[in-house]
Amino acid sequence: MASSRRIKQENIINVKRVSIDWFWWLALIAIWAISTWFDRTWLSNDQRLPSWDQAEYLSSALEHGRGLGLLAPGEWNGWQGLLDLSPKIPPLSALISGSVMAITGEASDKASWVLSLWHGLLIVTLAMWGRVLGGRKLGVLAAVLLVLSPAMAEHRVEFSLDLPLTTSCTLALFLLFQWQRPAPIGGTWKQAIAAALSIGAALLIKQSALLVLALPSIWVGLRALPVKPRRRQTVVSIFIVLSLLMPWLHHNWITTIGGTQRAVLISGAKEGDPGILNPLSLIWYPRLMPDQLGILILTIGIAGIGLALWNNRKQIYVLIQHPVKILPKGWPWLIGVTLMGWICTSLSPNKDARYIAPVLPMLILLITKGWLLIIDQAQKKIGRNKSWAALIACILVSGFLSIKQRWEDIVITAGSPAVNVLETINRLSKGEQTTLFMVSSDRNLNEQTLSYLGQINGRNIQARRLGRNKDHEELSLAQSKWWVLATGDQGTSRKSRQQLSRAVRKDSRFELIETWDWDDNRQIELWRRRNTAEAIEKFDNRFIKLARGLEKGPAALEPIFKEIEIQHLLDPGFNYQQRVETWANNRLQHNQIDQDALWSLALLRVLQNRPGKASLWFRKIESVSDEQNWASIYNLTVLLADWKTCKAAWLADNYLKSTFNKDESNLLFALRDLSRAACFDPRGPIGLATSLKPAIESVEKQINGDSI
């Protein structure tokens, strides 16, 4: 009888636990559903056009969806073709967004459903983390405060990488926390693999995930090394992360470095953000917290934590000395990773307000603990019912303030007649592939916005912004057909752009098609090349001549790539490349040593980021040349770009057995030593100490002494 009674009691307890879990999950679903309903309502009322970054991310998602073959008129072109679509930013978020677009639609509001999915995952992750730290109440309340946070509410409706990055980093840190816990709770293979996959996924969304994940990962890894099972798990986890990153990084590492430099170093300097050594860096983000988290949410949280510290003020010194021993389990980890993320983000040269987003969920967990501490104190003073009523009132007030702030940000007009311009072009061009040129950089009229809008709803229009250089004016006029110009302020103060606008209006080759009223007494004008004007000259013959100029060495590189850069603006589809490739292959069928064709194909492969194929063409040029030339130098360079460093070192040794001029020999010695160093050959770093300076001097001599 006693045993049956005990079994019955255990069954009742299990049923209660299941019921509580159901209520907990239903609460999270309700939180997500209510916040998503508000977001969709906000999006349906806000009519603004996607601006610079938003439009660029939408275009990237569109391209990746087409690259997967999920969106028309795209098709699957292999892994390399897919990796070509993400030269500067990792592709995971764009791949997910493009896949969701295939279901929801390509328009920005419909594509934003992917943000709701990221938001749901963030709610669950934060709630589970809170539940581990302080039970169900902490988890649910953290989810509520997350939804009410003004910054997170903004990220939920702004199509960018901020919400995907925040979600992936929070998930990675939570799974890393679970794995680093003492056995048998932590330290399992499943936890290690899950943490590794989540870290890899976060890095494949944006490189800046390193700011939040690098130090915690190193911290956990160092703690795991003395423990044999965890040491093996650490090695396997590192292998998993590298395996996820390497395909994209190997394909795009050069453009990634260049893009990161512009986005972080150059952009931060232009915006006047404090440098790494500037003390203002450390208070840059804390001063934004009232606006980011909400003044009431932050005040109550800090008050609760401050009250707890005051009540335990005699133990503060011991707490500072031994936080791991004094604080409840899990809280030292949360505080540690929050501080690491805040410090690393503060030290980044570019300090846009949204870059602190991955740290906000962890701050919200800490603030939520302060809320619960206030509730506990209130229960002792005024009773349980009144304290919970006060909590609900504070949540409602916070919700009202958050909704008020977001509602005031709604824009009920598009901001510019950009869609009307694109519809007119699409109608007149009969849906054919079209490039639209412009000089303006207004929030509602810029190349990113027009390019995205020009690629949806059956349109096939790309927009490009010209006028950065006065020398390009004549080339721009000679090779363009469609222009969109504006009167008044166009968001740019460069005289070269203003002069280009006037040149289009005065050029007899162009005619005004239509005008639209804009705001502030401005107008938008659509100009088209007259049918009677001379035909646009193709770039094919000029490209062949430029490619042959590679024979002249480093002196030719800058003018070659400068001209190709402007041509890629004029021809964003790179249509000339297919024509040149067809021409070159036909020439080689009749003459296998045709130098124009060989150099053209080699340069094409370099521009297409196919270093392996470029190497084959440079070797072909070497084999048919009567004497040694710069093709050998280029071959080593593309092999290094392809990470085939050992092969490059071996080839350089062979090249040095032949006769080269002094400048070529200096470069060969430096490239050989660089290849050896990258191949972990100790002779490499030693040799670079003496070979690097002569190589640089030879390049400078070539540039200063020769011209194409």
Predicted feature locations:
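Signature aromatic-anchored transmembrane alpha helix within multi-pass, membrane-resident enzymes
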Residues: S4, L28, L242, V318, ...
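C-terminal luminal/periplasmic domains and tails of membrane-associated envelope-modifying transferases
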Residues: A418-T435, Y452-I708
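Short acidic/glycine- and proline-prone juxtamembrane loop motifs at membrane-interface regions
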Residues: S112, A151-L165, D352-A353
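Extracytosolic helix-loop segments that constitute the early lumenal/periplasmic catalytic or substrate-binding loops
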Residues: W37-S44, A55-L85, L92-L95, I257
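Transmembrane-helix motifs of polytopic, lipid-linked glycan transferases
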Residues: K110-L133, L171, L175, A308-N311
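Membrane-interface transmembrane helices that cradle and orient dolichyl/undecaprenyl
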Residues: L133, A172-A192, A202, I374
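Transmembrane-lumen/periplasm boundary regions of multi-pass, lipid-linked membrane glycan transferases
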Residues: Y57-E63, G67, A201, I205, ...
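Start-transfer (signal-anchor) and selected internal transmembrane alpha helices
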Residues: M1-R40, Q233-V241
